């Protein structure tokens, strides 16, 4: 009766601890710290299955070899011994055991067993005191999913999965910051030339698609975290009275976060598409005006060059024509001056008049 009262009191304390989260509905942003903290706690260990002031049983999945059960108890009057039994009362040999005494002479016991195959639940940890001839027991029910290979592989990668996820997020943020810095400052030149080559290769549509993919890749990773967490959460069962309430609360929070992320992602895409269309429409008239102005300037420059060439050619032609006439008249004048059949006279008045 005393143990039952203590167990009910511990369950009431757990429910009182999480009850304020169910009564008042706050903004979704305030749940994010608890949301990620719960995930980290579940990554570290599965919460305690059975607790009391005397006996405590913990369930852990250290690797893919099996399920590890730990039973601890303190403040015992020596001598005392701890044993594990299955549902049929058969003794399960323990893997490790540890005992110690404090200054008051009270005994502290700790024992663990490694279950590689599914056993018939419940599993009982009992402590028998030889002096008082009394026995204390605590039982725990193991779900079948704990012995499935999918759950064991997921729990064995409990540190690699979050670290890989965080590494990808940090790498993408750092890469984006470096590219933005290089675009703004123009240094180093290698990155600037690389970006210019990429822009030259890609056309307008492909460039817009790459921009959208780059901007919303992090949002997609954030949204993809929720199904991963829910998949893990559904496998890591917590067998206590507050488990249904806790699971429903997490489901509601995940649904709210998913709806908000999808809504704001769609809104951002729509605004970006609208701005892109407006920018193209405003760019076409300015481009046509620039082209017409450029054609006019080019035609005017060509006409001025043609006029200059025409004037130069006319001047050259007139100059050569005058030189030709002057040379002809000079030759005729020389022939008339040195004709031996005529008297010596010079009559070049016509040449001077011309």
From Swiss-Prot:
Originating organism: Mus musculus
Reported tissue expression: Expressed in skin and thymus.
Signal peptide location: 1-52
InterPro entries, A to Z: BTN3A2-like_Ig-C (IPR053896), Ig-like_dom (IPR007110), Ig-like_fold (IPR013783), IgSF_BTN/MOG (IPR050504)
Cytoplasmic topological domain residue ranges: 180-209, 274-354
Ranges for domain Ig-like V-type: 53-141
Membrane topology according to the record: Multi-pass membrane protein
Similarity field: Belongs to the SKINT family.
Glycosylation sites: 129
Disulfide linkage: 71-125
Main localization, broad class: membrane
Protein name (Swiss-Prot/TrEMBL): Selection and upkeep of intraepithelial T-cells protein 10
């Amino acid at each position: 009766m005393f143990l039952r009262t203590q167990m009910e009191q511990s369950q009431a304390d757990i429910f009182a601890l999480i009850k304020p989260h169910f009564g008042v509905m706050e903004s979704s942003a305030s749940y994010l710290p608890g949301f990620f903290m719960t995930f980290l706690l579940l990554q570290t260990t599965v919460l305690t299955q059975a607790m009391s002031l005397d006996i405590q049983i913990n369930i852990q999945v250290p690797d893919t070899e099996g399920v590890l059960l730990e039973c601890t108890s303190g403040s015992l009057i020596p001598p005392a011994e701890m044993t594990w039994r299955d549902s049929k009362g058969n003794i399960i040999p323990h893997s490790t055991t540890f005992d110690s005494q404090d200054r008051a002479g009270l005994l502290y016991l700790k024992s663990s067993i490694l279950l590689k195959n599914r056993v018939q639940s419940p599993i009982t940890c009992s402590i028998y005191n030889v002096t008082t001839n009394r026995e204390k027991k605590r039982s725990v029910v193991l779900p079948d999913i704990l012995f499935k290979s999918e759950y064991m592989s997921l729990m064995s990668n409990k540190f690699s999965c979050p670290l890989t996820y965080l590494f990808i997020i940090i790498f993408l943020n750092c890469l984006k910051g470096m590219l933005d810095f290089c675009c703004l400052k123009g240094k180093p030149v290698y990155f600037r030339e690389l970006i210019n080559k990429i822009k030259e290769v890609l056309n307008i549509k492909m460039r817009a698609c790459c921009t959208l993919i780059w901007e919303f890749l992090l949002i997609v990773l954030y949204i993809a975290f929720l199904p991963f967490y829910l998949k893990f959460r559904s496998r890591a069962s917590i067998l206590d009275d507050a488990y249904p309430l806790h699971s429903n609360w997490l489901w509601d929070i995940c649904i709210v976060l998913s709806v908000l992320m999808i809504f704001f992602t769609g809104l951002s895409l729509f605004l970006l598409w609208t701005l892109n269309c407006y920018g193209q429409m405003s760019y076409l008239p300015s481009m046509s005006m620039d082209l017409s102005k450029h054609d006019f300037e080019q035609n005017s420059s060509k006409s001025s060059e043609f006029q200059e060439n025409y004037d130069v050619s006319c001047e050259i032609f007139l100059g050569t024509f005058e030189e030709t006439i002057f040379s002809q008249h000079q030759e005729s004048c020389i022939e008339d001056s040195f004709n031996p059949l005529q008297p010596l006279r010079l009559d070049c008045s016509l040449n001077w008049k011309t």
